[in-house]
Curated annotation (Swiss-Prot):
<dbReference type="InterPro" id="IPR023561">
    <property type="entry name" value="Carbonic_anhydrase_a-class"/>
</dbReference>
<dbReference type="GO" id="GO:0005576">
    <property type="term" value="C:extracellular region"/>
</dbReference>
<feature type="compositionally biased region" description="Basic and acidic residues">
    <location>
        <begin position="319"/>
        <end position="328"/>
    </location>
</feature>
<keyword id="KW-0732">Signal</keyword>
<dbReference type="GO" id="GO:0016836">
    <property type="term" value="F:hydro-lyase activity"/>
</dbReference>
<dbReference type="GO" id="GO:0008270">
    <property type="term" value="F:zinc ion binding"/>
</dbReference>
<feature type="glycosylation site" description="N-linked (GlcNAc...) asparagine">
    <location>
        <position position="260"/>
    </location>
</feature>
<keyword id="KW-0325">Glycoprotein</keyword>
<dbReference type="InterPro" id="IPR036398">
    <property type="entry name" value="CA_dom_sf"/>
</dbReference>
<dbReference type="GO" id="GO:0016323">
    <property type="term" value="C:basolateral plasma membrane"/>
</dbReference>
<feature type="region of interest" description="Disordered">
    <location>
        <begin position="299"/>
        <end position="328"/>
    </location>
</feature>
<dbReference type="InterPro" id="IPR001148">
    <property type="entry name" value="CA_dom"/>
</dbReference>
<dbReference type="InterPro" id="IPR041878">
    <property type="entry name" value="Alpha_CARP_X/XI"/>
</dbReference>
<feature type="domain" description="Alpha-carbonic anhydrase">
    <location>
        <begin position="33"/>
        <end position="303"/>
    </location>
</feature>
<keyword id="KW-0964">Secreted</keyword>
<feature type="glycosylation site" description="N-linked (GlcNAc...) asparagine">
    <location>
        <position position="118"/>
    </location>
</feature>
<protein>
    <recommendedName>
        <fullName>Carbonic anhydrase-related protein 11</fullName>
    </recommendedName>
</protein>
Length: 328
């Protein structure tokens, strides 16, 4: 059955009417960039998540895919895998630098070509190169992450998006092939303290430079390892990109210990606009795709569920940075 056939009659009528109206209002939208998290932007129809797989044939997996993301992780379904090695981060001993963007959909950090930052270990069979750091957050606390744990959301989610540099030459090619992508997700709560890496991104001097869509600000001397908790476990599953084209070539790795940012930092994020300054303000918050069915996919974790109260200790529960366990 085709994707369009899966629509209810009312939704189909809304879609076709909106497409007809869009054809008569201004220039035609770029089909590769015509999507949003909300169906209506400034009175104009822009395809939201229910329509992603219907407006572009290349995005059909968004509607008919069977391994879509994000998902709700029920901890009782997580299979303990004692053979999962620790995660490894390679920076060549250099500090990270790059550009922080307001894309109109996300807060996005794009690393400079050098140094090359790679992640390996855990469930990954190959080394994956960092392509983007993406921050998603909600309009209210506790409801901003894409993934959930036991039906519980978080205020924000940081996604480190990587491509398999051993099999593919770039992100685009990797997104179309098996074992192509790896995304590390870290959940974020609002608290009285703040993660040191996120503090660099969210301090007043930085965040006010990206108030509007297409604003950008260059950052340097960043220590990516400071983004990670001192010790943590992880849960992994096979899924997809959570934005069009929803390619099902992603190994997701969810860090099981949340980070913190302050309420002031979260408020600053919610003041970012998804529009340029010439248009009406619309908060960048709420930039997440709805949950997708997990179905029969396996969830694996490196922490023994028989000992949930025991803190994870030892080198297997630390990020290894350039070959050395990070933290005390």
């Amino acid at each position: 059955m085709g994707a369009a056939a899966r629509l209810s009659a009312p939704r189909a009528l809304v879609l076709w009417a909106a497409l007809g109206a869009a054809a008569h209002i201004g220039p035609a939208p770029d089909p590769e960039d015509w999507w949003s998290y909300k169906d209506n932007l400034q009175g104009n129809f822009v395809p939201g998540p229910p329509f992603w797989g219907l407006v572009n044939a290349a995005w059909s997996l968004c509607a008919v895919g069977k391994r879509q993301s994000p998902v709700d992780v029920e901890l009782k379904r997580v299979l303990y895998d004692p053979f999962l090695p620790p995660l490894r981060l390679s920076t060549g001993g250099e500090k990270l630098r790059g550009t922080l963007y307001n894309t109109g959909r996300h807060v996005s950090f794009l690393p400079a070509p050098r140094p090359v930052v790679n992640v390996s270990g855990g469930p990954l069979l190959y080394s994956h190169r960092l392509s983007e750091l993406r921050l998603l957050f909600g309009a209210r606390d506790g409801a901003g992450s894409e993934h959930q744990i036991n039906h519980q959301g978080f205020s924000a989610e940081v996604q480190l998006i990587h491509f398999n540099q051993e099999l593919y030459g770039n992100f685009s090619a990797a997104s179309r092939g098996p074992n192509g992508l790896a995304i590390l997700s870290l959940f974020v709560n609002v608290a009285s303290t703040s993660n040191p890496f996120l503090s660099r991104l969210l301090n007043r001097d930085t965040i006010t430079r990206i108030s509007y869509k297409n604003d950008a600000y260059f950052l340097q001397d960043l220590s990516l390892e400071l983004l990670f908790p001192e010790s943590f476990g992880f849960i992994t599953y096979q899924g997809s990109l959570s934005t069009p084209p929803c390619s099902e070539t992603v190994t997701w790795i969810l860090i099981d210990r949340a980070l913190n940012i302050t309420s002031l930092q979260m408020h600053s994020l919610r003041l970012l606009s998804q529009n340029p300054p010439s248009q009406i303000f619309q908060s960048l918050s709420g930039n997440s795709r709805p949950l997708q069915p997990l179905a029969h996919r396996a969830l694996r974790g490196n922490r023994d569920p028989r000992h949930p109260e025991r803190r994870c200790r030892g080198p297997n529960y630390r990020l290894h940075v350039d070959g050395v366990p990070h933290g005390r």
